[in-house]
């Protein structure tokens, strides 16, 4: 029996014009749970994440994160988003700022920390991702893997209750993926609640509590990793897993 969910979405729909991208998705995630979302391109995985923190406005449905109704017009969305860290495929770092500057910007502008407080918290976050010695480097002086670790540090510095990862390794050279996954494993060990959209199936098998398979805007099937990867019940899931295992 799942404890009271920290993330709860009900009946999520999202339209982009005539395109119906999410078709009534329900999602519950318990505190400290790591949920992996897999599926073909265009299945709605990234849109689901972006609807959870209202980077995209759902067309219908409800989203509650850590007790906050994310779709209530009275909700201070910037304050609410401090509880939801998000890491993107494309890093989204400011190129003219140092690694530390990128991490501390939101601490000062959103969380209202003094520069000294922000710098201390920022250095702690960079240390957690193994980049304290790169604090003074700009993104152009860092590898793609290091840039993504700075992006993770930026998110965790705000001490979120939930972390969303949208294909965090898909823009990286293969040899750089491991360092990012190791940081995610460390977050997992620390008890962070995480929802991950990724093609890193090995990581999903080894680290996830639960795997959701999405297709055409719907959750087709969900279950423990061994059930989804070894014995899926739905034909569409079997076809997808078979295809990725052949490559």
Predicted regions and their residues:
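The identity of the second residue at the extreme N-terminus of proteins
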Residues: 1-3
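ABC family nucleotide-binding domain
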Residues: 5-225
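C-terminal boundary and immediately downstream tail of ABC-type ATPase nucleotide-binding domains
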Residues: 222, 226-247
